C-alpha cells in the first residue's frame, strides 16, 4: 500500500526531533556511554524516591529508587521499552495480527503508547485528515471523536448502525457513488478513512458481528480505505468467545487499532496504545515528539509492574472479572428499564460495554434531559450529543450503568418514566 496518499500536508512536513532521536539512543546505550547531549534534569533533584502500591487482591508492587528514576525521567516517544514489549506480546496473544511479525511488509504492525485511547485517535486523525477529505463514520458515534473531526473541516458521511453494529449494506450503498479506481485519483473525494467502534459501542452498547466485520474489511480492501478500529470495550463483550478484531484479519496493513487500559485498570493513568501500519505509527510519533514527547513515565512503569505480575493469563482473568462486573450491572439496568420504561421507550440489550441506548416516545430529549431531568436529580446524556448534526431533534438518551447501584438505577428510571409522561403531556 502507498500510505503517502493518506497523510495530510502538516503530517508530511513533520521531521524527527533531533533531541528525541538522541533520547532514544541514550536510553538504549550501555552504561559506558557518556552523554552531554540531552537536557535531562538530574534525578538527584527529584523529591520522589520510591513508591509501593497495594492491589485489591492484597499483593503489592514496589517501585524502587532505580526504577523510579527511570519513571520520572524523559523516555523514548514510542513508550517505555518494557511496556511496548509486553503490549506487543499481548496483541500477538489475543489478536495474532497477520502482519505483526512481518518486518519486511510495508504495512507491518508497529505499536505506540499514548495518553489514553483518545489521544491516539486524535493523533491519527490529525495526521491524515484534510479539509477536502471525506471520512466515513458510524452513527450514532462517540462525541470525543466527533469533537476531533468537526474542526478539521472534513466531510463526514454517516453510516447507519443497528443492534448488530455498523450496517455494511449501507456502507456499500454509500460507496457505490465512487469506483474503486477513484482511490488512485488525488483529486477525487472518495473516502479514505472509516471510523467504527466494533464492540460495546458508545453510546449504543452494540457490537459488530464477525460476518459484518468481514464484509466491512472486504469493502475497505475494494475501495482502499483505512479502518480506524476504536475498541476500548473489546474485553467487555458479554458473550464468549469474543468476536475477533478487525486487526486480526488485516492482511494488507489497513487497520489502525486503538486499545485502552482505562476500562480495565485505571482511567486516571491515561494510558492506551495504538497498533497499526508502521508508516502511520511513525507519523503519529512525530506528532507526539512535537507535543507531549511521551506518555507519563510513572504511569507506564506502574502499569508495567502490574501487568508483569499478572502475566497474560492473569490479565485475561482480570478482564473476565471486570466483564462479569459490568454484565451484572447491565442486567440490573435492563431489569430497571423493563420495570419502569415499558411502553415509554424502546431498546435492545447491550452486547458489551457500559451503556444502554434508549429511544424515548417523545419528539426530542434535549431540553427534557438537560433541564427537567436535572431538576428531578437525575442525569442522562441526550441523544443529539452522539449525532453528526447535534442541532437536530433526537428521541434517544444514553444511560451509563457502570457506576450506579441497582437501587440507584431503579430510582433513576422511575424518575425518567415520570419525565417522559410529563413530556408527552407538555412537550418542551
Regions found by a protein language model. Give the residues of each.
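N-terminal "arm"/small-domain region of PLP-dependent enzymes with the aminotransferase-like
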Residues: 1-92, 375-379
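Short catalytic/ligand-binding loop motif for oxyanion handling, primarily in non-cytosolic enzymes
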Residues: 42-47, 202-205, 235-236, 265-267, ...
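Conserved core of the PLP fold type I
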Residues: 59-223, 228, 234-252, 256, ...
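Conserved glycine-rich beta-strand-loop-beta hairpin in the small C-terminal domain of fold type I
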Residues: 111, 319-334, 345-359, 369
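Conserved core segment of the aminotransferase class I/II
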Residues: 251-324
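Short hydrophobic/aromatic beta-strand micro-patches
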Residues: 275, 357-359, 400-402
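PLP-dependent enzyme catalytic core of the Aspartate aminotransferase-like
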Residues: 375, 388-428
Amino acid at each position: 500500500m502507498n500510505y503517502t496518499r493518506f497523510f495530510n500536508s502538516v503530517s508530511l512536513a513533520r521531521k524527527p526531533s533531533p533531541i528525541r532521536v538522541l533520547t532514544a539512543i541514550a536510553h538504549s546505550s550501555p552504561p559506558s556511554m557518556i552523554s552531554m547531549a540531552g537536557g535531562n534534569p538530574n534525578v538527584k533533584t527529584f523529591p520522589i524516591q520510591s513508591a509501593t502500591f497495594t492491589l485489591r487482591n492484597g499483593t503489592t508492587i514496589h517501585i524502587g529508587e532505580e526504577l523510579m528514576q527511570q519513571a520520572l525521567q524523559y523516555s523514548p516517544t514510542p513508550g517505555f521499552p518494557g511496556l511496548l514489549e509486553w503490549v506487543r506480546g499481548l496483541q500477538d496473544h489475543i489478536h495474532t495480527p497477520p502482519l505483526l511479525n512481518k518486518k519486511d511488509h510495508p504495512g507491518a504492525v508497529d505499536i505506540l503508547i499514548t495518553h489514553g485511547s483518545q489521544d491516539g485517535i486524535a493523533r491519527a486523525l490529525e495526521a491524515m485528515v484534510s479539509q477536502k477529505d471525506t471520512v466515513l463514520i458510524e452513527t450514532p458515534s462517540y462525541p470525543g471523536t466527533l469533537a476531533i473531526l468537526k474542526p478539521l473541516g472534513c466531510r463526514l458521511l454517516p453510516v447507519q448502525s443497528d443492534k448488530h453494529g455498523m450496517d455494511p449494506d449501507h456502507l456499500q450503498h454509500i460507496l457505490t457513488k465512487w469506483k474503486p479506481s477513484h482511490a488512485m485519483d488525488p483529486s477525487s473525494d472518495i473516502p479514505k478513512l472509516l471510523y467504527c467502534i466494533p464492540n460495546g459501542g458508545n453510546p449504543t452498547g452494540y457490537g459488530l458481528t464477525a460476518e459484518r466485520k468481514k464484509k466491512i474489511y472486504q469493502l475497505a480492501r475494494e475501495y482502499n480505505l483505512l479502518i480506524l478500529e476504536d475498541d476500548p470495550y473489546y474485553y467487555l463483550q458479554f458473550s464468549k468467545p469474543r468476536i475477533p478484531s478487525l486487526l486480526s484479519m488485516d492482511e494488507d496493513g489497513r487497520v489502525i487499532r486503538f486499545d485502552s487500559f482505562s476500562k480495565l485498570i485505571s482511567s486516571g493513568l491515561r494510558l492506551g496504545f495504538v497498533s497499526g501500519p508502521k508508516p502511520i505509527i511513525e507519523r503519529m510519533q512525530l506528532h507526539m515528539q512535537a507535543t507531549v514527547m511521551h506518555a507519563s513515565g510513572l504511569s507506564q512503569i506502574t502499569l508495567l509492574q502490574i501487568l508483569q505480575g499478572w502475566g497474560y493469563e492473569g490479565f485475561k482473568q482480570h478482564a473476565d472479572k471486570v466483564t462479569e462486573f459490568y454484565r451484572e450491572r447491565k442486567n440490573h439496568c435492563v431489569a430497571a428499564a423493563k420495570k419502569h420504561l415499558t411502553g415509554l421507550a424502546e431498546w435492545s440489550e447491550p452486547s458489551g460495554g457500559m451503556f444502554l441506548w434508549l429511544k424515548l416516545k417523545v419528539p426530542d430529549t434535549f431540553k427534557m434531559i438537560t433541564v427537567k431531568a436535572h431538576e428531578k436529580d437525575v442525569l442522562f446524556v441526550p441523544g443529539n450529543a452522539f449525532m453528526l448534526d447535534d442541532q437536530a431533534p433526537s428521541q434517544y438518551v444514553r444511560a451509563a450503568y457502570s457506576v450506579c447501584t441497582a437501587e440507584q438505577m431503579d430510582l433513576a428510571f422511575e424518575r425518567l418514566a415520570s419525565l417522559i409522561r410529563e413530556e408527552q403531556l407538555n412537550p418542551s
